[in-house]
A protein has these predicted regions:
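Perimembrane helix-loop-helix junctions
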Residues: 186-219
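Membrane-interface alpha helices of multi-pass inner-membrane proteins
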Residues: 165-180, 185-186, 191
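Membrane-interface micro-motifs in multi-pass membrane enzymes
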Residues: 66, 70, 114-159, 177-178, ...
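Membrane-interface transmembrane helices that cradle and orient dolichyl/undecaprenyl
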Residues: 151-165, 197-204
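Signature aromatic-anchored transmembrane alpha helix within multi-pass, membrane-resident enzymes
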Residues: 165-166, 288, 354-379
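Intrinsically disordered, polar/acidic, low-complexity terminal segments
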Residues: 2-63, 67, 74-101, 107-122, ...
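Transmembrane alpha-helix segments characteristic
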Residues: 122-123, 303-328, 370-371
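Membrane-lumen/periplasm interface segments of multi-pass, membrane-embedded glycan/lipid transferases
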Residues: 41-43, 48-50, 56-85, 211, ...
Length: 504
């Protein structure tokens, strides 16, 4: 078995080298700034340490993940990254998993052409979901990319069939147990492969049955995952939370099936129309026209049986649902982190170009996708630069705030109860206007809300402070309404034994 593995790796040497080098190059150009600077902010501030108490959940970051149904996320972190957010190491781990996922995808579709390998790596690495993760959710970046890898491997083992397909079940449990939305990667790749097989004139019945087999394996993985989630929560004395996009929130709304389907398709379509950077809309519009031409050429193939054409059409209609299944399961609510699979539509276009074998069309699509990747690289670096500027500005502000507290007579660090009211009033710079639309980047400071002060003092300032709870803070806001805002004189006051500082 070992000899067989080394023999396989030897045959894969060139493809592996291309994939890893391309992923590393794309990753460093697009996200290197985020990996090399301490731009930890938003949720990655509140979950910097795996076992730290959180501001918006009465428990640790690990318990929060488990309550969301991501019970394998803490396990992954302890096995690979450790208990803290380490930007450079997390980034390198993420690129490693992305490279392996791209290689697995290449094996799935038998991609050996160097140009297509490079584009596959670019699509997996330089997309807005990875950018949002790096900018504001760095604590989840490498774990989520590991979930992508598990989803790709699940599709590979499904394709192999025989006893290997049983490995699809635990791999999907891993995917769901780290980040549920990455299940869409598995669904998308299965649909891609079914479409390509139908184009190659494989029997529609055979493809249909294989598709049902993929659904059955996914259902089995989902059942095992759900049962394990309940068991883990029961053993740890936790309840599955209905907050955010956790498992307990699935299909709990009052929306009907038709309403959910509409929301799912619309959120997928609008992703390519309204998501920043806005220039990508033009490229997406041209790619849509190219896709129509490709489909016309494919459906014009006389040798292609009618059942195949009908099944291809059905799969294309279902593709947005598969890529955005999280929206359907989450009552129509979805954000950028949950839409990683949507960007794989670029890969499908290139695979169709390879099948049609029209050089002009292939070059046209490559140019457009290349422009999208370039636009994403530029956008990600703008966002990381903005985050770094805000990091430094916030550090300066909070250093002065800490000094103001320490100069107040009677204040004892770590013992006196403190209430900091409001957050920084940094102005949004018009040059960064589109970056504020990205999930997690809408706030002009690493301290997104008042619930993040505890994390900031412990993570960045490493200064002891005893902050009051949110209920007490809201009570004090009314009593401190007439206080001037920092740094004006009189911005601090003692109210019922609590030192209050009004920031804004």
């Amino acid at each position: 078995m070992v000899n067989s593995l080394f023999s396989r790796l030897s045959r894969e040497k060139e493809r592996l080298a291309t994939v890893f080098l391309a992923t590393l190059a794309f990753g460093l150009i697009a996200h290197g700034y985020g990996f090399l600077n301490f731009t930890v902010s938003h949720d990655s501030m509140n979950e910097f340490w795996l076992f730290q108490q959180m501001g918006y959940y009465s428990g640790t970051a690990a318990q929060w993940k488990i309550a969301l149904g991501r019970f394998l996320s803490p396990v992954y972190q302890l096995l690979f990254r450790g208990e803290t957010v380490a930007p450079w190491f997390s980034g390198m781990l993420a690129l490693c998993w992305i490279a392996l996922a791209a290689w697995g995808t290449a094996a799935l579709f038998d991609i050996r052409e160097r140009w297509l390998l490079i584009f596959t790596c670019g699509i997996f690495t330089v997309n807005l979901s990875v950018t949002a993760l790096t900018a504001s959710y760095l604590h989840d970046l490498d774990a989520d990319m590991f979930a992508v890898l598990a989803a790709v491997l699940a599709a590979l083992f499904w394709k192999r069939g025989t006893w290997h397909q049983l490995l699809t079940i635990p791999l999907l449990v891993v995917t769901l147990g780290i980040y549920q939305s990455m299940l869409s990667v598995y669904i998308s790749l299965v649909i891609f492969l079914c479409i390509l097989r139908l184009i190659q004139a494989d029997q529609a019945k055979s493809v249909f049955l294989d598709g049902l087999r993929a659904i059955g394996l996914m259902a089995a993985g989902g059942i095992v995952y759900f049962l394990l989630s309940k068991v883990v929560c029961s053993l740890l004395g936790l309840d599955l939370t209905t907050q955010e996009n956790g498992i307990a929130n699935m299909l709990t709304g009052s929306n009907g099936i038709l309403s959910l389907l509409t929301a799912t398709f619309l959120s997928w379509v609008t992703l390519f129309i309204t998501e920043a950077p806005r220039v990508n809309f033009l490229f997406h519009a041209l790619l849509f026209l190219a896709a129509l031409v490709l489909l016309f050429l494919l459906f014009s193939i006389k040798e292609l049986p009618t059942p195949n054409k009908l099944l291809i059409a059905l799969l294309l209609v279902l593709l947005p649902l598969g890529m955005n299944v999280s929206a359907f399961l989450n009552n129509g609510e979805v954000h950028l982190l949950m839409l990683y699979a949507a960007w794989l539509v670029y890969l499908l276009l290139l695979l169709l170009c390879r099948r049609v074998a029209k050089p002009g069309m292939t070059v046209f699509c490559c140019i457009l996708i290349g422009l999208i990747l370039f636009s994403n690289v530029r956008f990600s670096n703008e966002l990381y630069t903005r985050k770094d500027q805000e990091r430094q500005a916030t550090l300066s502000l909070m250093t002065r705030v800490t000094q103001q507290l320490e100069q107040t007579e009677g204040y004892i660090p770590g013992q006196t109860e403190v209430a900091i009211l409001g957050t920084s009033d940094f102005q949004s710079h018009p040059g960064y206007r589109q970056t504020y639309e990205t999930v997690g980047a809408v706030f002009p400071s690493p301290i997104s809300t008042e619930d993040f002060y505890g994390a900031y003092f412990s993570t960045v300032l490493q200064t002891p402070i005893r902050l009051c709870d949110s209920t007490r803070r809201e009570e004090l806001k009314a009593q401190a309404a007439d206080l001037p805002a920092f740094p004006d004189k009189g911005c601090t006051a003692w109210i019922d034994g609590t030192l209050v500082l009004k920031l804004s």
